[in-house]
Amino acid sequence: MSAQKPITHFGLRDITRYTTTVDSNGNGVFSRADQGDFEATMGDGRVARFDLFQAGQVPLNINDGADIKWSGENQPGLHVPNGVAFRMMDFAPEGGSDWHRAALFAFVIIVEGELELSLDGGETKVLLPGDTTLVRGPSHKVRNPSTAKPCRTLWVLLDITPTHINGKLLKHEMGHHTGEYQEGSK
């Protein structure tokens, strides 16, 4: 594969995050429309990450927009300790990840295209639009198997309690992806 410049949308339409709230009269209203809080290009420019919402605690405090303010000021790393991250990820044709392990719980929903999920135990599944997977700490890699079409996925990432497998603590093992998740404030 030849080296390409980083690209972010791969021919997919721009995403829009619509935020609702309750006005002073108690009516539901749309308060804003944007593309989320943070955006990053990963995987040698073949994967785009859009952080749509993150919270440092559950249940959420939505009084006076505290949740929206926190989300906009705190860029998540891989996930949010004791919280939740809501993320859209787009994959260019043949774009994907290397092997890695994330010590977290992820709901993954395929929105458009196909995503191949491989596990270190030797199993592989190709997920189609509408398919979901619950990723619970395995060493894995993902990739878009198409040579022509992009893939869009939606991720909800939750922290987990310390988990032991055969007496060994399950930890993040990000390999080549270690520097791709930057935590911090805007």
Curated annotation (Swiss-Prot):
Question: What keywords were assigned to this record?
Answer: Virulence
Q: Report the Pfam families cross-referenced here.
A: Cupin_2 (PF07883)
Q: In which pathway does it act?
A: Mycotoxin biosynthesis
Q: Start and end of every Cupin type-2 domain?
A: 88-156
Record keywords: Glycosyltransferase included? no
- The disulfides recorded in the entry are none
SUPFAM superfamilies given in the database record: RmlC-like cupins (SSF51182)
The task this protein performs is described as: Part of the gene cluster that mediates the biosynthesis of the selective antifungal agent ascochitine, an o-quinone methide that plays a possible protective role against other microbial competitors in nature and is considered to be important for pathogenicity of legume-associated Didymella species. The pathway probably begins with the synthesis of a keto-aldehyde intermediate by the ascochitine non-reducing polyketide synthase pksAC from successive condensations of 4 malonyl-CoA units, presumably with a simple acetyl-CoA starter unit.
| Protein family | Belongs to the oryJ family.
> Could you tell me what this protein is called?
Ascochitine biosynthesis cluster protein 2
* Organism, scientific name: Didymella fabae
Query: Which lineage is the organism of this entry classified under, starting from the top rank?
Result: Eukaryota, Fungi, Dikarya, Ascomycota, Pezizomycotina
